[in-house]
Swiss-Prot record:
It catalyses: 15-cis-phytoene + 5 A = all-trans-3,4-didehydrolycopene + 5 AH2. The gene is PDH1. It comes from Cercospora nicotianae. One of its GO terms (cellular component) is membrane. The chain crosses the membrane at residues 598-618. Pathway: Carotenoid biosynthesis; lycopene biosynthesis. This is Phytoene desaturase.
Amino acid sequence: MPSTSKRPTAIVIGSGVGGVSTAARLARAGFHVTVLEKNNFTGGRCSLIHHEGYRFDQGPSLLLLPGLFHRTFAELGTSLEQEGVKLLKCEPNYMIHFSDGEKFTLSSDLSVMKTEVEKWEGKEGYTRYLEFLKESHGHYELSVREVLLRNFEGLTAMLRPEFLRHLLQLHPFESIWTRAGKYFWTERLRRVFTFGSMYMGMSPFDAPGTYSLLQYTELAEGIWYPVGGFHRVVEALVKIGEREGVDFRMETAVKKILLSEDGGVAKGVELEDGRRLEADVVVNNSDLVYAYEKLLPIKTPYAESLKGRPGSCSSISFYWALDRQVPELEAHNIFLADEYRESFDSIFKKHLIPDEPSFYVNVPSRVDSTAAPEGKDSVVVLVPVGHLLEEDRHASQAHQLSASRNGHISSASPPDQPGLTPTEKQDWPAMISLARKTILSTIQSRTNVDLTPLIIHESTNSPLSWKQTFNLDRGAILGLSHSFFNVLCFRPTTRARKPGAFDAQLLKFGVLGRAAEVIIDAFRGRGKDIKGLYMVGASAHPGTGVPICLAGGALVAEQICGDYGVDIPWKEEERKGRDVGGKRKLDVLESPMWLDSWEQWVSVLIYLLVGIFAWLWMKFR
Protein backbone atom coordinates (compact mmCIF):
# COMPACT_ATOMS: atom_id res chain seq x y z
CA MET A 1 0.00 0.00 0.00
CA PRO A 2 1.18 3.58 -0.51
CA SER A 3 2.69 5.23 2.55
CA THR A 4 -0.35 7.44 3.06
CA SER A 5 -3.08 6.09 5.29
CA LYS A 6 -5.71 7.22 2.80
CA ARG A 7 -7.22 4.93 0.19
CA PRO A 8 -4.93 4.59 -2.84
CA THR A 9 -6.19 6.60 -5.79
CA ALA A 10 -6.51 5.59 -9.43
CA ILE A 11 -7.40 7.45 -12.61
CA VAL A 12 -8.72 5.49 -15.61
CA ILE A 13 -8.47 7.24 -18.99
CA GLY A 14 -11.35 6.09 -21.17
CA SER A 15 -14.57 4.21 -20.42
CA GLY A 16 -14.32 1.34 -22.86
CA VAL A 17 -15.07 -2.19 -21.66
CA GLY A 18 -11.50 -2.65 -20.41
CA GLY A 19 -11.58 0.67 -18.58
CA VAL A 20 -14.92 0.31 -16.79
CA SER A 21 -14.24 -3.30 -15.75
CA THR A 22 -10.80 -2.36 -14.40
CA ALA A 23 -12.31 0.61 -12.55
CA ALA A 24 -14.98 -1.56 -10.93
CA ARG A 25 -12.40 -4.15 -9.86
CA LEU A 26 -10.03 -1.54 -8.39
CA ALA A 27 -12.87 0.14 -6.50
CA ARG A 28 -13.90 -3.23 -5.08
CA ALA A 29 -10.31 -3.73 -3.94
CA GLY A 30 -10.39 -0.44 -2.04
CA PHE A 31 -9.05 2.13 -4.50
CA HIS A 32 -10.65 5.54 -4.95
CA VAL A 33 -11.23 5.50 -8.72
CA THR A 34 -12.00 8.30 -11.19
CA VAL A 35 -12.84 7.50 -14.82
CA LEU A 36 -12.26 10.26 -17.38
CA GLU A 37 -14.11 9.97 -20.71
CA LYS A 38 -13.77 12.42 -23.60
CA ASN A 39 -17.18 11.56 -25.11
CA ASN A 40 -20.61 12.03 -23.56
CA PHE A 41 -21.23 8.27 -23.49
CA THR A 42 -19.49 5.23 -22.04
CA GLY A 43 -18.39 2.07 -23.83
CA GLY A 44 -16.17 3.45 -26.57
CA ARG A 45 -16.83 1.38 -29.69
CA CYS A 46 -19.19 -0.73 -27.58
CA SER A 47 -21.87 1.97 -27.68
CA LEU A 48 -25.25 2.63 -29.28
CA ILE A 49 -26.70 4.82 -32.03
CA HIS A 50 -30.36 5.85 -31.73
CA HIS A 51 -32.75 7.32 -34.28
CA GLU A 52 -36.49 7.75 -33.74
CA GLY A 53 -37.07 4.38 -32.09
CA TYR A 54 -34.36 2.52 -34.01
CA ARG A 55 -31.30 1.26 -32.11
CA PHE A 56 -27.98 0.16 -33.54
CA ASP A 57 -24.85 -1.31 -31.96
CA GLN A 58 -22.08 1.02 -33.09
CA GLY A 59 -19.44 -1.68 -32.72
CA PRO A 60 -19.72 -5.24 -31.33
CA SER A 61 -22.99 -7.06 -31.91
CA LEU A 62 -22.01 -10.66 -31.10
CA LEU A 63 -21.48 -11.83 -27.53
CA LEU A 64 -18.88 -14.61 -27.74
CA LEU A 65 -16.93 -16.49 -25.06
CA PRO A 66 -19.80 -16.07 -22.57
CA GLY A 67 -17.74 -17.71 -19.84
CA LEU A 68 -15.49 -14.66 -19.61
CA PHE A 69 -18.52 -12.39 -19.15
CA HIS A 70 -19.96 -14.59 -16.40
CA ARG A 71 -16.53 -14.83 -14.76
CA THR A 72 -16.13 -11.03 -14.73
CA PHE A 73 -19.48 -10.40 -13.07
CA ALA A 74 -18.98 -13.26 -10.59
CA GLU A 75 -15.61 -11.80 -9.55
CA LEU A 76 -17.35 -8.46 -9.01
CA GLY A 77 -19.70 -10.17 -6.58
CA THR A 78 -22.75 -10.26 -8.82
CA SER A 79 -24.03 -11.78 -12.07
CA LEU A 80 -25.39 -10.69 -15.42
CA GLU A 81 -28.85 -11.77 -14.30
CA GLN A 82 -28.66 -9.82 -11.04
CA GLU A 83 -27.66 -6.71 -12.99
CA GLY A 84 -30.65 -7.08 -15.30
CA VAL A 85 -28.68 -8.16 -18.36
CA LYS A 86 -30.71 -10.75 -20.27
CA LEU A 87 -28.89 -12.73 -22.95
CA LEU A 88 -30.74 -14.12 -25.97
CA LYS A 89 -29.28 -17.01 -27.95
CA CYS A 90 -29.12 -16.39 -31.69
CA GLU A 91 -30.16 -19.40 -33.73
CA PRO A 92 -28.89 -19.95 -36.32
CA ASN A 93 -25.49 -18.41 -35.68
CA TYR A 94 -25.24 -17.10 -39.25
CA MET A 95 -26.76 -17.45 -42.66
CA ILE A 96 -23.87 -17.44 -45.12
CA HIS A 97 -24.63 -16.28 -48.66
CA PHE A 98 -22.42 -17.29 -51.60
CA SER A 99 -22.17 -15.59 -54.98
CA ASP A 100 -23.61 -18.66 -56.75
CA GLY A 101 -26.86 -18.34 -54.80
CA GLU A 102 -26.13 -21.17 -52.38
CA LYS A 103 -26.50 -20.71 -48.62
CA PHE A 104 -24.97 -22.36 -45.58
CA THR A 105 -26.55 -22.31 -42.12
CA LEU A 106 -23.99 -22.15 -39.31
CA SER A 107 -25.44 -23.39 -36.05
CA SER A 108 -24.51 -24.62 -32.58
CA ASP A 109 -27.03 -27.44 -33.16
CA LEU A 110 -25.09 -30.57 -34.17
CA SER A 111 -28.06 -32.01 -36.07
CA VAL A 112 -28.21 -28.87 -38.24
CA MET A 113 -24.45 -28.95 -38.81
CA LYS A 114 -24.57 -32.64 -39.74
CA THR A 115 -27.08 -31.88 -42.49
CA GLU A 116 -25.20 -28.81 -43.73
CA VAL A 117 -21.72 -30.37 -43.79
CA GLU A 118 -22.85 -33.67 -45.32
CA LYS A 119 -24.62 -31.75 -48.08
CA TRP A 120 -21.23 -30.64 -49.39
CA GLU A 121 -18.71 -33.18 -48.10
CA GLY A 122 -20.68 -36.34 -47.32
CA LYS A 123 -20.65 -38.43 -44.14
CA GLU A 124 -16.85 -38.43 -43.94
CA GLY A 125 -17.01 -34.66 -44.07
CA TYR A 126 -19.07 -34.62 -40.89
CA THR A 127 -16.51 -36.87 -39.20
CA ARG A 128 -13.81 -34.39 -40.20
CA TYR A 129 -15.98 -31.56 -38.86
CA LEU A 130 -16.04 -33.25 -35.44
CA GLU A 131 -12.24 -33.58 -35.63
CA PHE A 132 -12.06 -29.85 -36.41
CA LEU A 133 -14.18 -29.16 -33.33
CA LYS A 134 -11.79 -31.27 -31.25
CA GLU A 135 -8.77 -29.30 -32.45
CA SER A 136 -10.46 -25.91 -32.06
CA HIS A 137 -11.66 -26.96 -28.61
CA GLY A 138 -8.01 -27.53 -27.69
CA HIS A 139 -7.11 -24.08 -29.04
CA TYR A 140 -9.95 -22.57 -27.00
CA GLU A 141 -9.15 -24.23 -23.67
CA LEU A 142 -5.38 -23.70 -23.91
CA SER A 143 -5.76 -20.08 -25.00
CA VAL A 144 -8.15 -19.17 -22.20
CA ARG A 145 -6.12 -20.96 -19.52
CA GLU A 146 -2.57 -20.18 -20.65
CA VAL A 147 -2.96 -16.83 -22.45
CA LEU A 148 -6.13 -14.87 -21.68
CA LEU A 149 -6.03 -15.45 -17.92
CA ARG A 150 -2.27 -14.96 -17.56
CA ASN A 151 -0.12 -11.89 -17.87
CA PHE A 152 2.82 -11.91 -20.28
CA GLU A 153 5.12 -9.29 -18.79
CA GLY A 154 8.16 -10.40 -20.73
CA LEU A 155 10.12 -13.23 -22.28
CA THR A 156 10.19 -15.31 -19.09
CA ALA A 157 6.39 -15.54 -19.11
CA MET A 158 6.49 -17.06 -22.58
CA LEU A 159 9.28 -19.47 -21.61
CA ARG A 160 7.22 -21.07 -18.85
CA PRO A 161 7.46 -24.88 -19.29
CA GLU A 162 3.70 -25.28 -18.82
CA PHE A 163 3.16 -22.87 -21.73
CA LEU A 164 5.96 -24.05 -24.03
CA ARG A 165 4.83 -27.66 -23.91
CA HIS A 166 1.48 -26.56 -25.36
CA LEU A 167 2.78 -23.96 -27.83
CA LEU A 168 2.84 -26.18 -30.92
CA GLN A 169 -0.61 -27.53 -30.06
CA LEU A 170 -1.89 -24.00 -30.66
CA HIS A 171 -0.59 -24.05 -34.27
CA PRO A 172 0.66 -20.44 -34.14
CA PHE A 173 2.89 -20.91 -37.18
CA GLU A 174 0.12 -22.15 -39.50
CA SER A 175 -2.73 -20.02 -40.78
CA ILE A 176 -6.38 -20.65 -40.04
CA TRP A 177 -6.82 -21.33 -43.75
CA THR A 178 -4.10 -24.02 -43.71
CA ARG A 179 -5.53 -25.73 -40.63
CA ALA A 180 -9.08 -25.63 -42.04
CA GLY A 181 -7.82 -27.29 -45.21
CA LYS A 182 -6.93 -30.41 -43.22
CA TYR A 183 -10.55 -30.92 -42.21
CA PHE A 184 -12.62 -29.32 -44.96
CA TRP A 185 -11.89 -30.53 -48.47
CA THR A 186 -14.08 -28.14 -50.43
CA GLU A 187 -13.29 -24.49 -51.01
CA ARG A 188 -16.83 -23.65 -49.91
CA LEU A 189 -16.47 -25.08 -46.41
CA ARG A 190 -12.96 -23.74 -45.97
CA ARG A 191 -14.47 -20.29 -46.48
CA VAL A 192 -17.33 -21.03 -44.07
CA PHE A 193 -14.94 -21.97 -41.27
CA THR A 194 -12.33 -19.23 -41.76
CA PHE A 195 -14.17 -15.92 -42.31
CA GLY A 196 -14.27 -15.44 -38.51
CA SER A 197 -10.68 -14.20 -38.57
CA MET A 198 -12.23 -10.85 -39.56
CA TYR A 199 -13.22 -10.50 -35.88
CA MET A 200 -9.50 -10.30 -35.09
CA GLY A 201 -9.04 -7.79 -37.92
CA MET A 202 -6.94 -10.29 -39.90
CA SER A 203 -7.00 -12.23 -43.15
CA PRO A 204 -7.60 -16.00 -42.72
CA PHE A 205 -4.51 -16.50 -44.88
CA ASP A 206 -2.38 -14.73 -42.24
CA ALA A 207 -4.18 -15.28 -38.92
CA PRO A 208 -2.53 -17.97 -36.76
CA GLY A 209 -4.40 -21.27 -36.59
CA THR A 210 -4.92 -20.67 -32.87
CA TYR A 211 -7.82 -18.37 -33.64
CA SER A 212 -10.08 -21.22 -34.71
CA LEU A 213 -11.04 -20.86 -31.04
CA LEU A 214 -13.50 -18.21 -32.28
CA GLN A 215 -15.24 -20.75 -34.49
CA TYR A 216 -15.29 -23.15 -31.55
CA THR A 217 -16.98 -20.77 -29.12
CA GLU A 218 -19.62 -19.95 -31.76
CA LEU A 219 -20.27 -23.59 -32.61
CA ALA A 220 -20.09 -25.02 -29.09
CA GLU A 221 -21.33 -22.16 -26.89
CA GLY A 222 -23.42 -20.25 -29.39
CA ILE A 223 -23.78 -16.57 -30.25
CA TRP A 224 -25.62 -14.39 -27.74
CA TYR A 225 -27.14 -10.93 -27.75
CA PRO A 226 -27.99 -8.75 -24.72
CA VAL A 227 -31.56 -7.42 -24.77
CA GLY A 228 -31.31 -3.67 -25.19
CA GLY A 229 -28.03 -3.81 -27.11
CA PHE A 230 -24.45 -4.74 -26.34
CA HIS A 231 -24.03 -1.53 -24.36
CA ARG A 232 -26.20 -3.10 -21.64
CA VAL A 233 -23.08 -4.99 -20.51
CA VAL A 234 -21.15 -1.73 -20.21
CA GLU A 235 -24.05 -0.06 -18.39
CA ALA A 236 -24.09 -2.90 -15.87
CA LEU A 237 -20.34 -2.57 -15.26
CA VAL A 238 -20.72 1.19 -14.82
CA LYS A 239 -23.50 0.67 -12.24
CA ILE A 240 -21.35 -1.83 -10.35
CA GLY A 241 -18.50 0.66 -10.39
CA GLU A 242 -20.75 3.45 -9.14
CA ARG A 243 -21.96 1.24 -6.28
CA GLU A 244 -18.31 0.72 -5.35
CA GLY A 245 -17.71 4.48 -5.43
CA VAL A 246 -16.23 5.03 -8.91
CA ASP A 247 -16.53 8.65 -10.10
CA PHE A 248 -17.36 8.75 -13.84
CA ARG A 249 -16.69 12.11 -15.51
CA MET A 250 -18.04 12.46 -19.05
CA GLU A 251 -16.79 14.98 -21.64
CA THR A 252 -13.51 15.23 -19.76
CA ALA A 253 -10.65 14.83 -22.23
CA VAL A 254 -7.11 14.11 -21.07
CA LYS A 255 -4.35 16.21 -22.64
CA LYS A 256 -1.37 14.32 -21.23
CA ILE A 257 -0.22 11.88 -18.58
CA LEU A 258 1.97 13.47 -15.91
CA LEU A 259 5.28 11.75 -15.13
CA SER A 260 8.08 12.41 -12.66
CA GLU A 261 11.09 14.39 -13.89
CA ASP A 262 13.00 11.23 -14.78
CA GLY A 263 9.94 9.82 -16.59
CA GLY A 264 9.88 6.76 -14.37
CA VAL A 265 6.74 7.33 -12.27
CA ALA A 266 3.18 8.31 -13.23
CA LYS A 267 1.85 11.19 -11.13
CA GLY A 268 -1.57 11.87 -12.64
CA VAL A 269 -3.04 13.59 -15.70
CA GLU A 270 -3.52 17.04 -17.17
CA LEU A 271 -6.94 17.72 -18.70
CA GLU A 272 -7.63 19.64 -21.89
CA ASP A 273 -8.90 22.56 -19.80
CA GLY A 274 -5.56 22.77 -17.97
CA ARG A 275 -6.61 21.21 -14.67
CA ARG A 276 -4.32 18.62 -13.13
CA LEU A 277 -5.46 15.52 -11.27
CA GLU A 278 -3.02 13.50 -9.19
CA ALA A 279 -3.25 9.78 -8.47
CA ASP A 280 -1.17 6.85 -7.26
CA VAL A 281 -2.15 4.86 -10.34
CA VAL A 282 -3.05 5.81 -13.92
CA VAL A 283 -4.71 3.21 -16.15
CA ASN A 284 -4.87 4.07 -19.84
CA ASN A 285 -7.88 2.69 -21.72
CA SER A 286 -7.58 5.03 -24.68
CA ASP A 287 -6.03 3.59 -27.84
CA LEU A 288 -2.58 2.35 -26.78
CA VAL A 289 -0.67 3.68 -29.80
CA TYR A 290 -2.41 7.04 -29.41
CA ALA A 291 -1.47 7.13 -25.72
CA TYR A 292 2.23 6.47 -26.33
CA GLU A 293 2.29 8.98 -29.18
CA LYS A 294 0.05 11.76 -27.82
CA LEU A 295 -0.47 11.43 -24.06
CA LEU A 296 3.05 10.75 -22.82
CA PRO A 297 5.04 13.99 -22.49
CA ILE A 298 7.95 12.89 -24.70
CA LYS A 299 7.65 11.12 -28.05
CA THR A 300 10.00 8.12 -28.01
CA PRO A 301 11.37 5.59 -30.53
CA TYR A 302 9.10 3.02 -28.88
CA ALA A 303 6.05 5.12 -29.78
CA GLU A 304 7.41 5.32 -33.32
CA SER A 305 7.85 1.55 -33.45
CA LEU A 306 4.23 1.02 -32.35
CA LYS A 307 3.05 3.19 -35.24
CA GLY A 308 5.03 0.95 -37.58
CA ARG A 309 3.52 -2.30 -36.36
CA PRO A 310 0.85 -3.95 -38.51
CA GLY A 311 -2.63 -2.82 -37.54
CA SER A 312 -5.95 -4.56 -37.83
CA CYS A 313 -8.45 -3.60 -40.50
CA SER A 314 -10.91 -0.75 -40.26
CA SER A 315 -14.50 -0.68 -41.48
CA ILE A 316 -17.10 1.26 -43.35
CA SER A 317 -20.24 0.69 -41.31
CA PHE A 318 -23.77 1.55 -42.36
CA TYR A 319 -26.66 1.86 -39.89
CA TRP A 320 -29.97 1.65 -41.76
CA ALA A 321 -33.48 2.27 -40.45
CA LEU A 322 -35.90 0.28 -42.66
CA ASP A 323 -39.57 1.09 -43.03
CA ARG A 324 -40.55 -2.60 -42.97
CA GLN A 325 -39.18 -5.95 -41.85
CA VAL A 326 -37.02 -8.01 -44.20
CA PRO A 327 -37.53 -11.69 -43.22
CA GLU A 328 -35.03 -12.77 -45.89
CA LEU A 329 -32.27 -11.65 -43.50
CA GLU A 330 -31.42 -13.50 -40.28
CA ALA A 331 -30.03 -11.78 -37.18
CA HIS A 332 -26.48 -12.43 -38.42
CA ASN A 333 -25.64 -12.74 -42.12
CA ILE A 334 -22.34 -13.14 -43.94
CA PHE A 335 -22.00 -12.37 -47.65
CA LEU A 336 -18.77 -13.93 -48.93
CA ALA A 337 -16.90 -12.59 -51.93
CA ASP A 338 -16.40 -14.88 -54.91
CA GLU A 339 -12.73 -13.83 -55.10
CA TYR A 340 -12.15 -14.69 -51.45
CA ARG A 341 -8.36 -14.39 -51.17
CA GLU A 342 -8.20 -11.34 -53.43
CA SER A 343 -10.77 -9.55 -51.27
CA PHE A 344 -8.57 -9.96 -48.20
CA ASP A 345 -5.46 -8.90 -50.12
CA SER A 346 -7.22 -5.64 -51.05
CA ILE A 347 -7.92 -4.95 -47.38
CA PHE A 348 -4.68 -6.01 -45.73
CA LYS A 349 -2.09 -5.37 -48.44
CA LYS A 350 -3.51 -2.49 -50.49
CA HIS A 351 -5.55 -0.98 -47.60
CA LEU A 352 -8.52 -0.36 -49.89
CA ILE A 353 -12.03 -1.70 -50.25
CA PRO A 354 -12.19 -4.86 -52.40
CA ASP A 355 -13.99 -4.69 -55.74
CA GLU A 356 -16.25 -7.39 -54.29
CA PRO A 357 -16.01 -7.33 -50.49
CA SER A 358 -17.07 -9.95 -47.99
CA PHE A 359 -19.30 -8.24 -45.44
CA TYR A 360 -21.45 -8.79 -42.36
CA VAL A 361 -25.11 -7.79 -41.98
CA ASN A 362 -26.65 -7.64 -38.51
CA VAL A 363 -30.40 -7.29 -37.97
CA PRO A 364 -30.70 -6.82 -34.18
CA SER A 365 -34.48 -6.44 -34.40
CA ARG A 366 -34.67 -10.04 -35.60
CA VAL A 367 -33.68 -11.31 -32.14
CA ASP A 368 -34.57 -8.27 -29.98
CA SER A 369 -37.82 -6.51 -30.91
CA THR A 370 -36.82 -3.41 -28.92
CA ALA A 371 -34.20 -2.55 -31.58
CA ALA A 372 -36.79 -1.11 -33.99
CA PRO A 373 -40.39 0.15 -34.04
CA GLU A 374 -43.01 -2.56 -34.48
CA GLY A 375 -43.07 -4.01 -37.99
CA LYS A 376 -39.74 -2.42 -38.95
CA ASP A 377 -36.08 -3.46 -38.94
CA SER A 378 -32.80 -1.89 -37.91
CA VAL A 379 -29.84 -3.08 -39.99
CA VAL A 380 -26.09 -2.73 -39.44
CA VAL A 381 -23.68 -3.49 -42.29
CA LEU A 382 -19.98 -3.84 -41.54
CA VAL A 383 -17.64 -3.77 -44.54
CA PRO A 384 -14.00 -4.51 -43.61
CA VAL A 385 -11.61 -2.08 -45.33
CA GLY A 386 -7.97 -1.15 -45.03
CA HIS A 387 -6.92 1.13 -42.19
CA LEU A 388 -5.76 4.69 -42.83
CA LEU A 389 -2.44 5.14 -44.57
CA GLU A 390 0.22 7.58 -43.35
CA GLU A 391 -1.09 10.53 -45.35
CA ASP A 392 -4.51 10.21 -43.68
CA ARG A 393 -3.30 9.50 -40.13
CA HIS A 394 -3.14 13.13 -39.13
CA ALA A 395 -6.13 14.37 -41.13
CA SER A 396 -7.05 17.66 -39.50
CA GLN A 397 -10.62 17.92 -40.69
CA ALA A 398 -13.33 16.58 -38.41
CA HIS A 399 -14.97 13.36 -39.52
CA GLN A 400 -17.87 12.42 -37.27
CA LEU A 401 -20.56 9.80 -37.62
CA SER A 402 -22.63 11.02 -40.57
CA ALA A 403 -26.34 10.63 -41.26
CA SER A 404 -28.68 11.08 -44.21
CA ARG A 405 -32.19 10.26 -45.36
CA ASN A 406 -33.38 8.16 -48.27
CA GLY A 407 -33.27 10.90 -50.87
CA HIS A 408 -29.51 10.98 -50.54
CA ILE A 409 -29.12 7.20 -50.39
CA SER A 410 -31.04 6.24 -53.51
CA SER A 411 -28.93 8.55 -55.65
CA ALA A 412 -25.67 8.29 -53.74
CA SER A 413 -23.93 5.93 -56.12
CA PRO A 414 -24.93 6.51 -59.74
CA PRO A 415 -22.98 4.36 -62.23
CA ASP A 416 -21.20 7.35 -63.74
CA GLN A 417 -20.06 8.88 -60.44
CA PRO A 418 -16.42 9.93 -60.84
CA GLY A 419 -13.88 8.41 -58.48
CA LEU A 420 -16.15 5.47 -57.72
CA THR A 421 -13.41 2.85 -58.05
CA PRO A 422 -10.35 4.11 -56.14
CA THR A 423 -7.37 1.88 -56.84
CA GLU A 424 -4.32 3.85 -55.80
CA LYS A 425 -5.31 6.03 -52.85
CA GLN A 426 -7.85 6.17 -50.07
CA ASP A 427 -10.58 8.40 -51.46
CA TRP A 428 -13.01 7.82 -48.59
CA PRO A 429 -16.11 9.58 -49.98
CA ALA A 430 -15.75 7.50 -53.14
CA MET A 431 -15.05 4.34 -51.15
CA ILE A 432 -18.15 4.85 -48.99
CA SER A 433 -20.28 5.35 -52.11
CA LEU A 434 -18.71 2.29 -53.70
CA ALA A 435 -19.33 0.22 -50.57
CA ARG A 436 -22.99 1.29 -50.36
CA LYS A 437 -23.62 0.57 -54.05
CA THR A 438 -21.88 -2.82 -53.89
CA ILE A 439 -23.58 -3.92 -50.68
CA LEU A 440 -27.08 -3.02 -51.86
CA SER A 441 -26.48 -4.73 -55.19
CA THR A 442 -25.06 -7.88 -53.56
CA ILE A 443 -27.90 -8.19 -51.05
CA GLN A 444 -30.46 -7.78 -53.84
CA SER A 445 -28.81 -10.37 -56.10
CA ARG A 446 -28.54 -12.98 -53.32
CA THR A 447 -31.82 -12.44 -51.43
CA ASN A 448 -34.05 -10.86 -54.12
CA VAL A 449 -34.70 -7.92 -51.80
CA ASP A 450 -33.91 -4.35 -52.82
CA LEU A 451 -33.19 -2.48 -49.59
CA THR A 452 -32.63 0.89 -51.28
CA PRO A 453 -36.25 2.14 -51.20
CA LEU A 454 -36.73 0.71 -47.68
CA ILE A 455 -33.98 2.82 -46.05
CA ILE A 456 -35.54 5.85 -44.39
CA HIS A 457 -32.41 6.91 -42.50
CA GLU A 458 -28.71 6.11 -42.70
CA SER A 459 -25.74 6.76 -40.42
CA THR A 460 -22.21 5.81 -41.42
CA ASN A 461 -18.81 5.28 -39.84
CA SER A 462 -15.54 5.18 -41.78
CA PRO A 463 -11.87 4.88 -40.76
CA LEU A 464 -11.79 8.67 -40.48
CA SER A 465 -14.72 8.83 -38.06
CA TRP A 466 -13.41 5.87 -36.04
CA LYS A 467 -10.16 7.79 -35.64
CA GLN A 468 -11.83 11.11 -34.86
CA THR A 469 -14.37 9.83 -32.33
CA PHE A 470 -12.29 7.23 -30.51
CA ASN A 471 -8.67 8.29 -31.18
CA LEU A 472 -8.04 4.96 -32.91
CA ASP A 473 -4.59 4.84 -34.49
CA ARG A 474 -5.03 4.60 -38.28
CA GLY A 475 -8.75 4.12 -37.65
CA ALA A 476 -8.02 0.43 -36.99
CA ILE A 477 -11.15 -0.78 -35.20
CA LEU A 478 -9.46 -3.75 -33.51
CA GLY A 479 -6.15 -2.17 -32.55
CA LEU A 480 -2.83 -3.74 -33.40
CA SER A 481 -2.76 -6.91 -35.48
CA HIS A 482 -2.70 -10.34 -33.82
CA SER A 483 0.09 -11.85 -35.89
CA PHE A 484 2.56 -14.00 -33.91
CA PHE A 485 5.04 -11.17 -33.30
CA ASN A 486 2.21 -8.98 -32.01
CA VAL A 487 0.91 -11.29 -29.30
CA LEU A 488 2.10 -12.89 -26.06
CA CYS A 489 5.32 -11.24 -24.85
CA PHE A 490 5.65 -9.36 -28.16
CA ARG A 491 2.41 -7.43 -27.60
CA PRO A 492 2.62 -4.17 -25.63
CA THR A 493 2.53 -5.12 -21.96
CA THR A 494 -0.01 -4.07 -19.36
CA ARG A 495 2.72 -2.13 -17.54
CA ALA A 496 3.68 0.98 -19.51
CA ARG A 497 7.19 0.78 -20.93
CA LYS A 498 10.02 3.26 -20.45
CA PRO A 499 12.23 3.98 -23.47
CA GLY A 500 15.25 1.70 -23.83
CA ALA A 501 18.79 2.74 -24.73
CA PHE A 502 18.71 0.82 -28.02
CA ASP A 503 15.12 1.54 -29.12
CA ALA A 504 16.14 3.90 -31.93
CA GLN A 505 18.53 1.33 -33.42
CA LEU A 506 16.09 -1.57 -33.06
CA LEU A 507 13.40 0.44 -34.85
CA LYS A 508 15.20 -0.19 -38.16
CA PHE A 509 14.96 -3.98 -37.97
CA GLY A 510 11.19 -4.57 -37.84
CA VAL A 511 10.22 -7.97 -36.42
CA LEU A 512 13.82 -8.88 -35.59
CA GLY A 513 14.17 -5.60 -33.73
CA ARG A 514 11.00 -6.39 -31.80
CA ALA A 515 12.37 -9.79 -30.78
CA ALA A 516 15.64 -8.17 -29.68
CA GLU A 517 13.65 -5.57 -27.73
CA VAL A 518 11.88 -8.31 -25.77
CA ILE A 519 15.20 -10.01 -24.95
CA ILE A 520 16.81 -6.74 -23.82
CA ASP A 521 13.76 -5.87 -21.73
CA ALA A 522 14.12 -9.22 -19.95
CA PHE A 523 17.49 -8.01 -18.63
CA ARG A 524 16.07 -4.58 -17.75
CA GLY A 525 13.54 -6.21 -15.43
CA ARG A 526 11.18 -3.84 -13.65
CA GLY A 527 13.50 -1.00 -14.63
CA LYS A 528 11.75 -0.99 -18.01
CA ASP A 529 8.38 -0.03 -16.47
CA ILE A 530 6.87 3.37 -15.82
CA LYS A 531 5.79 2.85 -12.23
CA GLY A 532 2.10 3.45 -11.65
CA LEU A 533 1.10 3.54 -15.34
CA TYR A 534 -0.82 0.63 -16.84
CA MET A 535 -2.40 -0.20 -20.20
CA VAL A 536 -5.69 -2.01 -20.82
CA GLY A 537 -7.59 -2.44 -24.07
CA ALA A 538 -7.45 -3.90 -27.55
CA SER A 539 -3.77 -3.21 -28.32
CA ALA A 540 -2.42 -4.33 -24.93
CA HIS A 541 -2.10 -7.94 -23.78
CA PRO A 542 -4.13 -10.16 -24.08
CA GLY A 543 -5.72 -8.53 -27.15
CA THR A 544 -8.87 -7.31 -28.87
CA GLY A 545 -12.55 -8.10 -28.52
CA VAL A 546 -14.96 -7.41 -25.66
CA PRO A 547 -14.43 -10.67 -23.72
CA ILE A 548 -10.66 -10.43 -24.22
CA CYS A 549 -10.65 -6.85 -22.89
CA LEU A 550 -12.63 -8.05 -19.87
CA ALA A 551 -9.89 -10.62 -19.26
CA GLY A 552 -7.33 -7.83 -19.68
CA GLY A 553 -9.16 -5.75 -17.08
CA ALA A 554 -8.78 -8.59 -14.57
CA LEU A 555 -5.06 -8.95 -15.33
CA VAL A 556 -4.41 -5.23 -14.89
CA ALA A 557 -6.45 -4.92 -11.69
CA GLU A 558 -4.67 -7.92 -10.15
CA GLN A 559 -1.31 -6.55 -11.25
CA ILE A 560 -2.03 -3.17 -9.63
CA CYS A 561 -3.23 -4.79 -6.41
CA GLY A 562 -0.05 -6.87 -6.32
CA ASP A 563 2.17 -3.84 -6.92
CA TYR A 564 0.46 -1.85 -4.15
CA GLY A 565 0.06 -4.65 -1.63
CA VAL A 566 -3.73 -4.65 -1.80
CA ASP A 567 -5.73 -7.83 -1.26
CA ILE A 568 -7.61 -9.08 -4.32
CA PRO A 569 -11.22 -9.64 -3.16
CA TRP A 570 -12.18 -12.21 -5.80
CA LYS A 571 -9.06 -14.27 -5.10
CA GLU A 572 -9.86 -14.23 -1.38
CA GLU A 573 -13.41 -15.38 -2.12
CA GLU A 574 -12.10 -18.14 -4.35
CA ARG A 575 -9.86 -19.39 -1.56
CA LYS A 576 -12.81 -19.41 0.83
CA GLY A 577 -14.73 -21.62 -1.57
CA ARG A 578 -17.36 -19.12 -2.61
CA ASP A 579 -18.97 -19.17 -6.02
CA VAL A 580 -16.38 -17.40 -8.19
CA GLY A 581 -16.04 -17.94 -11.92
CA GLY A 582 -18.99 -20.33 -11.82
CA LYS A 583 -17.56 -23.08 -9.53
CA ARG A 584 -17.55 -24.01 -5.86
CA LYS A 585 -15.01 -26.31 -4.25
CA LEU A 586 -17.50 -29.17 -4.44
CA ASP A 587 -17.69 -28.71 -8.22
CA VAL A 588 -13.96 -28.62 -8.99
CA LEU A 589 -13.09 -31.38 -11.43
CA GLU A 590 -10.51 -33.97 -10.37
CA SER A 591 -9.42 -36.72 -12.71
CA PRO A 592 -9.69 -40.22 -11.17
CA MET A 593 -6.58 -41.93 -9.86
CA TRP A 594 -5.00 -44.55 -12.05
CA LEU A 595 -5.95 -48.12 -11.08
CA ASP A 596 -9.16 -47.03 -9.40
CA SER A 597 -11.29 -49.94 -10.65
CA TRP A 598 -11.10 -53.74 -10.44
CA GLU A 599 -11.04 -53.99 -14.25
CA GLN A 600 -7.78 -52.02 -14.36
CA TRP A 601 -6.24 -54.19 -11.61
CA VAL A 602 -7.22 -57.40 -13.45
CA SER A 603 -5.73 -56.02 -16.68
CA VAL A 604 -2.44 -55.22 -14.94
CA LEU A 605 -2.29 -58.69 -13.33
CA ILE A 606 -2.93 -60.35 -16.69
CA TYR A 607 -0.13 -58.34 -18.30
CA LEU A 608 2.21 -59.26 -15.43
CA LEU A 609 1.34 -62.98 -15.65
CA VAL A 610 1.78 -63.02 -19.42
CA GLY A 611 5.10 -61.24 -19.00
CA ILE A 612 6.31 -63.69 -16.35
CA PHE A 613 5.27 -66.77 -18.36
CA ALA A 614 6.93 -65.33 -21.48
CA TRP A 615 10.15 -64.73 -19.54
CA LEU A 616 10.11 -68.25 -18.02
CA TRP A 617 9.43 -69.82 -21.41
CA MET A 618 12.34 -67.95 -22.99
CA LYS A 619 14.64 -68.88 -20.09
CA PHE A 620 13.87 -72.61 -19.76
CA ARG A 621 12.79 -73.72 -23.22
